A protein has these predicted regions:
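N-terminal, polar/Ser/Thr-rich
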Residues: 1-36, 115-124, 131, 136, ...
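Surface-exposed beta-strand/loop patches in extracellular or lumenal glycoproteins
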Residues: 40-62, 135-138, 144-153, 424, ...
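A surface-exposed beta-strand-loop module
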Residues: 46-117, 138, 174-175, 521-538
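Extended, low-hydrophobicity, Ser/Thr/Pro/Gly-biased non-transmembrane segments
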Residues: 100-203, 230, 570-574
Length: 883
């Protein structure tokens, strides 16, 4: 390997730190271009044995001003200053180290460490940002108690915040002031936070179950406080839910949230001072959609839940990232399920998993939930670590039962509060609390790839038995050519001709053990489960509730799938039957398009959709999901060689078929779900809007042949009294060429030009348009005043939306989308390598396309890798993508 290429870090090389930092006293004198940081560290040796080991502190982009050991100022010969380190060769066993550095937050476009966003000082220290503030043992297994003093100009920065409790605040000379914060709970450096600025505040209170009165504050830019009410409500509901569901109570008297407009992530769980991308805090009916409200609920709860699963108990090393993230995503999924509709929440989570994580598991960037190596840890904040990690936790709950899982959580907290631990420690707590062996189950942490199940059911009328045979395999992934059989919890059911669940009695069980639906433990390469005393079944229902994140091959006719769509007692399986029915039809149409001979769609599918539309007992949010077709990304994953044009044509043809066949049903449902009531973000109201707009989507499928569609969409856009309905109409209109499209886009920008979050929606809508000139429009928008490469939200809204969410135009046969992607990656890398790397994944899927596209995608990756001074972030993704 050439010496200028970054090297990998391996999990197997973990060693405990040689030194521990017990207390940290920080002093900040804030100035945008020249902030001085003083750090006093109380350090003790943590190694056994003879000899003296060097102290090596991490540092990045720091100007070192002074170092003192036990009060003695060190000369240049007393330490070694490296490009990214500060080394003291032979320190004593216990000592105090004083370090003074100077940093330039205003120039920190990476948004890692201390930076300035809209005149607000802000930090982001996860994963390795603290080393950009001062020299430190910047690793998660070094936990210390922090005391932070902040000094700043009183007029420009009246609000001074850090972790823990405010213990002192006073005026200083020269128009400055100071605040001192103390966090009594030991924490790793990645959880340190500081915010200073001129901010408005929404204050509320929460009383814990033990009677503690907690002050809750959300800080935002002036003029935006009125848009924080929903986030505050979510926070209070999250605190109560965690007490009731897991017995976990908040532990300080103050909980602060700050929303900023420039942020690499969605939010950050710093102890008692959460910092949020403002898109996950600000909402009102005129600027936020139902999806935005749901996103706020998810992210606010997620970051609060980290107080115990992430802050009080943290990761030993970054390979254990899913210990906190997978567990906390599972917890926020459970919270949303309890607050809204559990079936609909499950469906939406599975849609997201299949769109983001399944392709990751099937591509060159596949990695286990607990990775074995990385070059840049920022690249492993992935769908696998988060979403698949959450599925692993969910399967634990399925295997152990809800009560058993709670016992495991209680033991985990009891054993490890205040510690930095591993995924194995969590699994051990679950196993020990329930007296079970999770050895095979833990392969979910170490094996990459999406397991594939082949399922076959056979009924024997002679003895009333049903044999269910399940074969499993996990395909090869980079570095893991051979896989062991997994422990897969598979929820199944059998339905009779009336759609009722048949009680299932496994061979060898007493009749009293029979249940309607069973969770089978699939543990071998192939197993057969035999059920006794089974009346003739009509249909087999598998992976109910999406009990395991697997792909399934199961031969079922259209009639069987239609029956399940109408009768399965498990809502997820009912939805899934429709998804698989539609997928089979559209993939068949793709093959026909490629052959040049197209037949009509099976009318049974449209009729099954009609039954859903006519079923007034169904929850509207579920009906909206049930009539929605699988996305192009899901269809692509089912193809050996992806054909984006044929997929698009097949989807549009099926949409049009449904629109024509069910026109009267669609019109009736659209009218029935209209409401004159004031906007409310509650689940029931959101469900009505979701169903009405899903129905509208089918009407729009006829735009090419019905000249009334575009004017109708423009009318609905103009008449909308909330952002959900306005965006729904505009999203459909951007795919229809004509004057109405441009009129609506111009009006939208004129209405919301002063609201950056809403303008982000305007950018994204244009980036995902199916029209042929979309890339030209995206390029033009790069020069629009609304866009800035320095702002991650803008980059994600325009460039990210085009490359990740517009497969038809991104994968244009001429390669223009790939060339644009490579060009923008190289432009963004020097500004913000973390964001540049995260947007690169679509280019790495080159192996799934035809030879011509493969060559063009590889050329884009090679162009990136050939660039000088490439960041480790982008280098890792690009090099692994090429293989």
């Amino acid at each position: 390997m050439p010496k200028d290429q970054p090297t990998a870090i391996h999990r197997q090389d973990y060693r405990p730190p040689d030194y521990r930092i017990e207390t940290v006293d920080l002093e900040f004198d804030l100035e945008p271009t020249a902030t001085r940081v003083k750090a006093r560290l109380a350090i003790k040796a943590a190694y056994d044995g003879g000899g003296v080991r060097p102290l090596v502190l991490h540092g990045d982009a720091l100007e070192l001003l002074s170092v003192a050991l036990d009060g003695r100022v060190l000369g240049a010969g007393d330490y070694v200053l490296g490009d990214k380190s500060l080394t003291i060769a032979a320190p004593p066993a216990s000592f105090t180290l004083d370090i003074e550095t100077r940093i330039n937050p205003a120039a920190n476009t990476q948004l890692s460490g201390l930076y300035v966003s809209n005149n607000v000082f802000c930090t982001q220290c996860e994963a390795e940002g603290f080393r950009r503030i001062t020299y430190f043992l910047d690793r998660p297994d070094v936990m210390a108690v922090y005391r932070t003093t902040i000094r700043a100009d009183r007029q420009r920065y009246p609000v001074l915040l850090s972790n823990g409790n405010l213990v002192e605040q006073r005026e200083l000379e020269g128009g400055r002031h100071m605040a001192v914060w103390h966090d009594p709970f030991p924490k790793p450096s990645y959880l340190f936070a500081l915010v200073a600025g001129d901010l408005a505040c929404n204050e509320d209170h929460f009383k814990t179950r033990s009677g503690r009165d907690v002050t809750l504050r959300i800080f935002v830019e002036h003029g935006k406080v009125e848009r924080t009410g929903y986030a505050m409500d979510c926070l209070k509901r999250s605190m109560r839910w965690d007490e009731e569901r897991f017995g976990l109570e908040y532990d300080l008297d103050l909980f602060n949230i700050v929303a900023v407009s420039d942020f690499n992530m969605g939010a950050m769980e710093n102890k008692s001072l959460n910092v949020f991308n403002d898109r996950y805090i600000l909402a009102d009916p005129q600027t936020a959609t139902d999806a935005d409200y749901a996103g706020i609920e998810t992210v606010v709860s997620h970051e609060y839940f980290h107080n115990w699963t992430g802050d009080r108990i943290t990761c030993r090393d970054w390979f254990q990232l899913s210990l906190k993230e997978g567990l906390t995503v599972f917890r926020d999924h459970e919270f949303s399920s309890d607050q809204r509709s559990r079936p609909v929440t499950r469906i939406q989570n599975v849609r997201a998993l299949r769109a983001r994580q399944f392709p990751e598991d099937g591509g060159p960037l596949a990695h286990p939930v607990r990775p074995d190596s990385y070059i840049e840890i920022n690249n492993f904040y992935t769908a696998t670590v988060y979403e698949k990690g959450a599925e692993v936790i969910g399967m634990m709950q399925t295997v152990l039962g809800r009560d058993g899982f709670r016992k495991g959580m209680d033991l985990y907290v009891q054993r490890h509060d205040g510690q930095a631990v591993t995924c194995d420690d969590f699994a051990a707590a679950m196993a020990d609390a329930n007296g079970v062996d999770l050895g095979q189950f833990k392969l979910w942490y170490s094996q990459a790839g999406t397991p594939e199940l082949t399922i076959e059911g056979k009924y024997d009328a002679r003895d009333g038995s049903y044999a269910l045979t399940v074969a499993q395999r996990c395909p090869p992934t980079p570095g893991q050519p051979d896989k062991k059989p997994m422990h897969i919890p598979l929820a199944v059911g059998l339905l009779d001709a009336q759609g009722r669940d048949i009680r299932l009695q496994l061979d060898g069980e007493d009749a009293a053990a029979a249940q309607e639906g069973r969770v089978l433990a699939v543990t071998a390469p192939q197993q057969t489960f035999r059920f006794r005393n089974v009346p003739k079944p009509k249909a087999l229902s598998v992976n109910r509730g999406f009990s395991a994140p697997v792909n399934i091959t199961l031969k079922q006719s259209g009639a069987e799938r239609a029956f399940l769509m109408g009768h399965d007692s498990d809502p997820f399986a009912r939805w899934e039957a429709g998804q698989q029915f539609a997928t089979d039809l559209m993939l068949k149409r793709v093959e026909e398009i490629q052959r040049g001979a197209v037949s009509a769609y099976d009318p049974a599918f449209a009729e099954a959709i009609g039954h859903i539309l006519r079923d007034e007992k169904l929850e509207t949010a579920f009906a909206a999901e049930a009539i929605a077709l699988p996305g192009a990304d899901y269809l692509a994953e089912r193809m050996a060689v992806i054909d984006v044009e044929a997929i698009h044509a097949a989807r549009e043809a099926l949409r049009a078929t449904i629109a024509k066949t069910l026109r009267l049903d669609l019109e009736r449902v659209f009218a029935a779900n209209r409401s004159d009531a004031p906007f409310s973000p509650d689940a029931q109201s959101a469900g009505r809007r979701a169903l009405r707009n899903a129905v509208l989507g089918y009407r729009a499928a006829l735009a090419a042949e019905d000249p009334d569609v575009a004017p109708h969409l423009l009318h609905l856009y103009s008449a909308a009294d909330n952002m959900t309905d306005r965006m729904a109409a505009l999203r459909l209109l951007v795919d229809v060429a004509g004057a109405e499209r441009q009129a609506a886009l111009d009006d939208f920008y004129d209405r919301y030009r002063d609201d950056p979050l809403v303008v982000d929606k305007w950018l994204s809508l244009q980036a995902v348009s199916a029209l042929p000139d979309t890339l030209d429009r995206v390029k033009a928008l790069l020069g629009h005043p609304a866009f800035a490469m320095e702002k991650p939200n803008k980059v994600r809204a325009l460039i990210g939306a085009f490359t990740a969410s517009n497969p038809l135009r991104y994968h244009a046969a001429d390669g223009s989308g790939y060339a644009f992607h490579a060009e923008r990656t190289l432009a963004l890398d020097p500004i913000n390598p973390q964001v540049a790397a995260r947007l690169l994944a679509p280019l790495g899927r080159w192996q799934r396309f035809d030879g011509d596209r493969q060559a063009k995608m590889k050329a884009g990756l090679q162009r990136i890798l050939a660039a000088p001074k490439l960041s480790p972030d982008v280098y890792e993704i690009a090099s692994k993508s090429l293989g």
